[in-house]
Amino acid sequence: PQPNNNMATVRNGSYSIPNSFGVLLEDSLVAATLIFGGVLERYPDLKICIAHGGGPACFGAGRWDRGWQVRSEARINISNPPSTYLKKMYYDCITMSETALRFLIDTVGIDRVVLGSDWPYVTWDPSPVSWILNERYLLLSFSL
C-alpha cells in the first residue's frame, strides 16, 4: 500500500491518516483477501510476507474466526479458521511499537517475523537492526 494513495485517503486525507492508519488497513485487507479467498489453502507452500506487521490483521483474528464460525459465506473458500492461515504467512517487524511487535510474535510465532525497514517512506532512528536489538522483550525471550 502507498502512504498517499489508499482507502483512508478517500475518507480523510488529513493529519497523515493515510500514512499512519490507511497503510495498516490496506495491509490487513491484503491478508484477509488472501485468507478468505482461499489462496493459502489452495497453495499451501506459497510464501507471502505482509508489511507493517500485518497491520491490524492479527489483532482482528478473533473476530475473523468468529465470522468464519457463524457466517457461511466466510467458509466458502477455506476449511479452517482464518487465524490458522495467519500463522502461515510472514510479517515484517515494522510495528513501531514493542507492544505491537510482542503481540505479533505471540500470535504468529517469532519464526514468522522478518526484519523490515519501511524505507523509503519512513526514516528510522535508530536503524531497524538497532531497534530490534534494543527490544527488551526479544532479548529476554529469545536470547538474541
Model-derived segments and spans:
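H/E-rich (His + Asp/Glu) clusters that bind or coordinate divalent metals
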Residues: N12-G38, R42-Y43, K47-L144
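Short glycine-enriched loops at secondary-structure junctions
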Residues: P1-N6, W119-Y121
